[in-house]
From Swiss-Prot:
A motif (DECD box) lies at residues 211-214. The keyword Cytoplasm does not apply. ATP-binding RNA helicase involved in transcription elongation and required for the export of mRNA out of the nucleus. SUB2 also plays a role in pre-mRNA splicing and spliceosome assembly. May be involved in rDNA and telomeric silencing, and maintenance of genome integrity. It catalyses: ATP + H2O = ADP + phosphate + H(+). This is ATP-dependent RNA helicase SUB2-2. It is an enzyme of class 3 (hydrolase). Residues 89-264 form the Helicase ATP-binding domain. It comes from the Eukaryota. Residues 292-437 form the Helicase C-terminal domain.
Amino acid sequence: MSHEGEEDLLEYSDNEQEIQVDATNINESAVDATVSETAEGATTDSEKKGSYVGIHSTGFKDFLLKPELARAIIDCGFEHPSEVQQHTIPQSIHGTDVLCQAKSGLGKTAVFVLSTLQQLDPVPGEVSVVVICNARELAYQIRNEYLRFSKYMPDVKTAVFYGGTPITKDAELLKNKETAPHIVVATPGRLKALVRDKLIDLSHVKNFVIDECDKVLEELDMRRDVQDIFRATPRDKQVMMFSATLSEEIRPICRRFLQNPLEIFVDDEAKLTLHGLQQYYIKLQENEKNRKLAQLLDDLEFNQVIIFVKSTKRANELTKLLNESNFPAITVHGNMKQAERIARYKAFKEFEKRICVSTDVFGRGIDIERINLAINYDLTTEADQYLHRVGRAGRFGTKGLAISFVSSPEDEEVLGKIQERFDVKIAEFPEEGIDPSTYLNN
């Protein structure tokens, strides 16, 4: 198959019928859940992937998961699934293909982690699960979720592969049956290199997952890597795709990798902003940003804060300034060596520092539960990226606060697009400040 042009895509079906599923009375959030069923050969596919119409569960115990998984879920303190988990897990554990859009913090990662672990029957030396994501930190985080939920499944081995590290170490791990993983979490470039050099065998893969699928598939080079990896896996497998944002343009591309998929869209496109997240802007001059930031860090109550800037240089300079001003801060950006980025991510996650200055490398999918304040020191240029940024605060249905600095006509234009795109009113931050109870959990 040629690699030239966007039409070089794997495609299983052109003729789909959408069936609306009643998703009312879940909670206060509106849920738009649709099931797409292939018209031709639907019976065969349904038998193969599992029948899913009308299946609903209200507690994790209702999913009838393996005892080892149920025990790990209890250890994590989870009892009731989120909207996306409630709609998706009952079908995904039976092998149904999934295309899922749900806003940040609703537990999409747990959907595919629990579903693949439920189906996993580990065989020494065989890779059964492949998870692809666009960022190294996200790959590391997903691996940790697998470790957390497989803690009572001692035979299950998980590995993470990403660029910036010696590929020889990956090869050594893969060729040894004692260390070879059953679950592989990887970025597309490194996994393609392992496939190309015949260092990994994907002929036994049963579950193929793409997290942040819009970001992975919208870039042609990354999409081509995914296609090459996809071709190295069996045709008969489960495919699941997840993202917080899923435009109408990218959905057909995603569907070409899927067979008879369950499609879940939690909240429609205009309501993707986070429940419980207070959002404000502050209009100021560029040279006023540092003073205003220091004032906010002094005045606001927060557990951890992430401050987004537009470049590596600004991240380094702002972090230096904050530390000199007695605001101990850590910085994370894409120009760091991989080991350093991971070490700093871990340090921030483990609460060694309360303030993190970052470029958009932390703008997608990163879960750090203590973050309840996000500040756009430099406002993003894209509305969708705004959602991913502010989604770092107020995750898992908790409260949070997002403040954006607006310092140019371009920023004002972007702010308008954000409000229009997500049908949300972002108010000006009051001079007297705000009540901490509006953005802090009790």
